[in-house]
Amino acid sequence: MNNNDESSFVFRQLFDKDTGTFTYLMFDSDTLEGLIIDPVKEQFDRSLQFIEELGIELKYAIDTHVHADHITSSRMLRDATGAKSTFGENSSVQGADIRLNDGDELEFGHFKLKAISTPGHTDACTSFYTEGRLFTGDSLLIRGCGRTDFQQGDPEKLFNSITQKLYAYPDSTLVYPGHDYLGRTASCIIEEKSFNPRIHSGQTLEKFVQIMNNLNLPKPKRIDEAIPLNLKCGFSLELGHVNEDNFTMHDLHQLLDKLTPTERVIDVRKPNEYDQGHVPGSLNIPMGNEREFIDEIRGYDRVFLHCHSGRRAQTVYTMLSMQGLEN
C-alpha cells in the first residue's frame, strides 16, 4: 500500500459487453497522471473521452497479456496521448515501449503500480497491484481462472502463479479480473481462496491440472484476428500509415489551390486549437468524433487529415480505415 493519502487516487472500472472485458482507468487527482489497463479497440472513443474529460495525462497503456478474444487499443492510445504501451517482459509483442519484469513499478503521480509475473494462462501474463487492489487479467477470475490450452499456457504455472503470488496478498485485497460474464465486478482474495471451485486454498496441483486439461472449451471466436493484431500492440500494420512527408507552407498552399469540391482537409484537433488557427476551409472533426461524421466523410472523394504533430491524424486514419474508408 502506498503511504500517500489515498484520497487523490481515482479509479474507474469500464466494461465492454460484447467481449465481457474489463478496462481499468486510474489516476492521481493531484497531478492528473494516470494509466489504463486492458483497453479495448472498439471502446477507444469512450476511453479517450474519459481521459480528455477528466484531464488525465495518460502515462501508460497496459496490457496484461496478448489477448485472444479482443483487440487492444494500447497503440491507438499511445498515438493519441503519448502514453507508453506496456507489456510483460516475456511477451513477443512488436513495438511495445516498456516490457515489465516481475516486481517492476510504474509511477503515476503519488502512486505506484507493481507488476507481478503470473504466467499460466499465457506465458507472458502479468498482474498488477496498487492501493489494495489486484488487477489479475485472465489469470485469476471471479470463481474461476483463465484457460491454459493455447499461447503456451501451462496449468502448473498458473497454479503456482495464483497460489504462490496472488494468494500471498492479504485476504482483504480486492480482485479485479480481466473478464466476467455473469455481471460480477470484483472479488477479494479470501473469497477466491474459499469459494473458487478450480483453485480454492485446499486445491491440489494434481486436481487442478486434471480440471484444466479437461475443460474442452471452444476456441475464442476472434482468436485468429486478435492474436496477430495484439502482437503488434493492436495496430494492424496492413492498414498502412498516413503520409509522413513534411509539408512546407508552399506545399500546403499548392494543395489547397488544387482541392476540388469533392476533396476536403479535416482538422482532427480540439475546437480550441482549431479556433487559434487552422487551414482555410478545413472541417473540424476532433479525434474521437469521426464516427459521428462517417457518412459526411464518405461523401468526399478524398480527405486530408491534419493535426499538430501527425499523431492524432494517424489515429483517426486507423479508425477510418477500420470503418472501410479508402479515400
Regions found by a protein language model. Name each.
Residues 36-37, 264-269, 285:
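Short hydrophobic beta-strand that contains or immediately precedes a catalytic carboxylate
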Residues 19-20, 41-117, 318:
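Active-site HxH/HxHxD metal-binding segment of metal-dependent hydrolases
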Residues 3-57, 127-136, 143, 270:
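Conserved beta-strand hairpin/beta-sheet module of binuclear metal-dependent hydrolase folds
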Residues 36-39, 58-67, 85-90, 118-120, ...:
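Active-site neighborhood of phospho(di)ester-bond hydrolases with catalytic His/Asp-centered motifs
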Residues 25, 105-130, 168, 246:
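Core dinuclear metal-dependent hydrolase active-site scaffold
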Residues 26, 38, 65, 77, ...:
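Divalent metal-coordination and catalytic microenvironments
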Residues 1-4, 160-174, 178-264:
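Accessory terminal helices/loops
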Residues 116, 285-327:
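Catalytic cysteine-centered active loop of the rhodanese-like fold, especially the PTP/DSP P-loop
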